[in-house]
Curated annotation (Swiss-Prot):
Entry similarity comment: Belongs to the G-protein coupled receptor 1 family.
GO MF term set: G protein-coupled serotonin receptor activity
Pfam families membership: 7tm_1
Swiss-Prot/TrEMBL keywords: Cell membrane, Endosome, G-protein coupled receptor, Glycoprotein, Membrane, Receptor, Transducer, Transmembrane, Transmembrane helix
SUPFAM superfamilies assigned: Family A G protein-coupled receptor-like
Membrane topology: Multi-pass membrane protein
Protein name stated in the entry: 5-hydroxytryptamine receptor 4
Annotated spans, Disordered: 112-137
Length: 137
């Protein structure tokens, strides 16, 4: 699952640039472009016009209404998909940390000293490693 030794080979400057460009391009595609093209008003222009005439004509406020397909698409692309990806990423991190903690615990049990012996320097390092890995649990 985790391969920290090949991270530098996988995360090249080009790949980082593509990921960053995607982080900016996706919001532009789901917000700026459709709003400027009027796609968010398809089917509800009559409602917007009614609201304009009901308000004071000297007012400086902005009426922003969107149709259901646009609202659903934006919600899915901008919230639900990133939310799902973050939950999956954190789940993988959690599972990996639990596996590593279990492996460390098994290694520590395999090297446990017999009763009655004084602890050696190796046992001190094992105890230190145990306390340092509690964060992974």
């Amino acid at each position: 699952c985790c391969q920290p030794l090949v991270y530098r080979n996988k995360m090249t400057p080009l790949r980082v640039a593509v990921l960053l460009a995607g982080c900016w391009a996706i919001p532009v595609l789901i917000s700026f472009l459709p709003i400027m093209q009027g796609w968010n008003n398809i089917g509800i222009t009559d409602l917007i016009e009614k609201r304009k005439f009901h308000q004071n004509s000297n007012s400086t406020y902005c009426i922003f209404m969107v149709n259901k397909p646009y609202a659903i698409t934006c919600s899915v692309v901008a919230f639900y998909i990133p939310f799902l990806l973050m939950v999956l990423a954190y789940w993988r991190i959690y599972v990996t940390a639990k596996e590593h903690a279990h492996q460390i615990q098994m290694l520590q049990r395999a090297g446990a000293p017999a009763e009655g012996r004084p602890p050696s320097a190796d046992q001190h390092s094992t105890h230190r490693m145990r306390t340092e890995t509690k964060a992974a649990k």
